[in-house]
Amino acid sequence: MRLGFDHYTIAHRGLTPEQALWFAREHGLEGVQFLEPASLDADLDPGRLAAVRRQAEALGLFLEIGLPSPNPVRLSRQEGREVSAAEHASRLRPHLEAVASLGCRDARAYVGDRHDRFRSDVSWSSQVAATAAVLRELRPTLLDLGLKVAVETHADLTTDELLKLVSDVGEDVLGVTLDTGNLLMRLDDPLRAAERLAPHVRMTHVKDCVIAFTPRGLSWQARPVGSGVVPMTDILAALARANPALNLSIELHPRIYDLPIFDPGWLAHFPALRPSDLAAVVRLAADCERKYAEGSLQRPEVVEAIPWDVRDLEWLARSVGYLRPVVGILSGL
């Protein structure tokens, strides 16, 4: 397992792709995951993409990449008209070709942001079905290029929904990008979810998190890897058993997210929620509250008062410091 980071962690610093690769090298990391090919070159210029690939290879770094969302409902909303599955797939094909030109075999993608599940104009199930239709349109291209789309646990899909999507579209063209911290945002028991997803995981976003009780239910905040309540060593062990060559890409960011589980209307958007999963998340919140009370863990609002550009590098360094020995142990298994 090699240890890298997702460019989103330092996107606010305005580094070019070349500078981001050097940043990884200078900070002892082994690779970079970028948002999508257009973040390397807006025109998907083959020469420009080839230059980034050559630099990564020269520095001995792995290069990972994502795609624009295959959810056509998001694009329809942006353009104010209905975009068909065939049209959206045709727009994504040049991005897939760019992914292949970078030497990548997998491309991260997300179905929705944290708001899409709760939209009143288009149901979440309709959005997932529309996304599946786009991905089916892309099957021949993916097979021809030898690529898989690795759909992320992106504060949108539950584990059940993601596994069904992989099954419906086909394991030969679809996999998973596992975000370790986001699992709790969709009310999944993180360890159980990771164990179920592990056989399909192709890419990662490794982050920790904390949970707190609020008058509306819960709040969620990312934390440096190893400093929160995600059962990280157990999750990483499950991933290592399934794929010892998996890259681990650290992804960290600011902000506190609201999880109003006391609101029946909000909770109704999780019709298949298992009591055991919700109980696992609430138990982790209780663990956090105990640590807040004893002073061994800072409350989310205290941490969030610190500007992100003041804590980003420290968080990254702490995450690397935690993961290095863990990866070393897992690599020896």
Regions found by a protein language model. Name each.
Residues 2, 18-25, 159-173, 184-333:
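Histidine-acidic metal/acid-base catalytic patches
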Residues 6-10, 35-39, 68-72, 112-114, ...:
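Active-site beta-loop-alpha junctions enriched in small/polar residues
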Residues 45-51, 85, 89-92, 124-135, ...:
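Charged helix-capping and loop-helix junction motifs
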